[in-house]
Amino acid sequence: MDTNKQKALDLAIKQIDKAFGKGALVKLGDKQIEPIESISTGSLGLDLALGIGGVPKGRIVEIYGPESSGKTTLALQIIAEAQKKGGVAAFIDAEHALDVLYAKNLGVDIDNLLVSQPDFGEQALDIVETIARSGAVDVIVIDSVAALTPKAEIEGEMGDSHMGLQARLMSQALRKLTGVVHKMDTTVIFINQIRMKIGAMGYGTPETTTGGNALKFYASVRVDVRRIATLKQGESQIGNRVRAKVVKNKVAPPFRQAEFDIMFGEGISKEGELIDYGVKMDIIDKSGSWFSYKDIKLGQGRENAKAYLKEHPEVAQEIENEIRRAMGMDDSVMMVPENEMSEE
């Protein structure tokens, strides 16, 4: 760059620093590249699929899927993992349907969980913005977008038309939230439902998420959660097999997916994942129907091996550490350059 241009640029930077504060405009080469921190999802496979060991801190995340697919369970597991690391979490219960005992069973510290049950959408999103601006909360979960009903709709008459009100509300809120959560390093997770597009024909999926298109664009990560099988023990249903697909990822390559078990009343089965990934990575030996780790016989059949790991958490932790090392997930901080790898 010639001398005159450099002088003009230096002057412009000084003016910007004076108007907006030092560091408002910097050369990327002068700024230290910081690693992207993450919060574990409670699922080894999903942590791997997300590419950085969990959901990114300081970003907006959307978890969506059909009813009873495990969306809220996954969000509560993320809260539990954040709390285990000493983090503070908030749950905005717009659906007024939080099961406190279930959350406790998943490992959530309910005594220290911040909970709000707002009356309408604007109130919910104002609360989210206020606690995000405090910089004291690590993760905020909103359950769900569909329940963020605008005040005008609640106060209106049944049958009144309120076309596009919720979409406008979400668009306005996300414009304000994106910068705040990044600056304060707070992860905001929106749980969303799916609907069928009216009059959808031809190619492409007939499904869409609620609340307009704003969340699709502002979310750094979008995870599609689907139930793919029912787990049974004899005639009794004991859980669901779930597939989680990362359909958008701005911090790592997208379109990876993971499968894991969600057990009724317990949440994500970490023991099941340890066995699946342990066998896949030759950390656990499978001979016929027997599973063994080093000189330890874990049991005959997958359910017995899971039961052994549940009864012997020190063995489960040792296996998990080996798997995480093999996956390159020793820590929740992964050195991945920030990029815009997927817009949808």
UniProtKB/Swiss-Prot annotation:
It is found in: Cytoplasm. GO terms for molecular function: ATP binding; ATP hydrolysis activity; ATP-dependent DNA damage sensor activity; damaged DNA binding; single-stranded DNA binding. GO terms for biological process: DNA recombination; DNA repair; SOS response. Gene3D superfamilies: P-loop containing nucleotide triphosphate hydrolases. Keywords: ATP-binding, Cytoplasm, DNA damage, DNA recombination, DNA repair, DNA-binding, Nucleotide-binding, SOS response. ATP binds at residues 65-72. InterPro entries: AAA+_ATPase, DNA_recomb/repair_RecA, DNA_recomb/repair_RecA_CS, P-loop_NTPase, RecA-like_C, RecA-like_N, RecA_ATP-bd, RecA_C_sf. Its main location: cytoplasm. It holds the Pfam family RecA. GO terms for cellular component: cytosol. Signal peptide: none annotated. Belongs to the RecA family. Can catalyze the hydrolysis of ATP in the presence of single-stranded DNA, the ATP-dependent uptake of single-stranded DNA by duplex DNA, and the ATP-dependent hybridization of homologous single-stranded DNAs. It interacts with LexA causing its activation and leading to its autocatalytic cleavage. This is Protein RecA. The gene is recA.
